[in-house]
Design a protein with these regions (language model features):
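N-terminal, polar/charged subdomain of small-to-medium soluble alpha/beta proteins
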Residues: 1-114
Length: 114
């Protein structure tokens, strides 16, 4: 039975918020289901002046993605981070899939019209 991804969530210079931690962990697990090549999620939430920043690094088989978001509210920064990660992971995933299709299409001779 395959294990789930390794998820590390850090709250830097702020108190840990269990509700946000649980929503981030759930979001990471859903992303790992959709993108099975991912093996590790590292997320860091920190205050930044008047708002909050969220950083993430996702690694896995042929996958390395980094993301950064900002928002006034900590929860909003966390939600934006998950949305950004999904978009970036989809981009990397599609590149891996369509790269092979493009290569196969280039190697296949085109049919001539008669």
């Amino acid at each position: 039975m395959p294990r789930g991804p390794n998820i590390v969530i850090s709250f830097k210079d702020i108190a840990s918020d269990e509700e946000i931690r649980q929503s981030l962990e759930l979001g990471c697990r859903q992303l790992a289901e959709e993108f099975p090549e991912t093996t590790r999620f590292e997320l860091t939430l920190a205050p930044d002046g008047a708002g909050h920043t969220a950083h993430a690094h996702v690694t896995g088989r042929n996958t390395e993605v980094a993301a950064h978001t900002e928002a006034i509210e900590l929860g909003a920064a966390a939600v934006r981070l998950l949305d950004t990660l999904e978009r970036l992971l989809r981009k990397v995933h599609d590149k891996h899939i369509f790269k092979n299709r493009r290569r196969a299409a280039q190697l296949t001779p085109k049919k001539r019209r008669r």
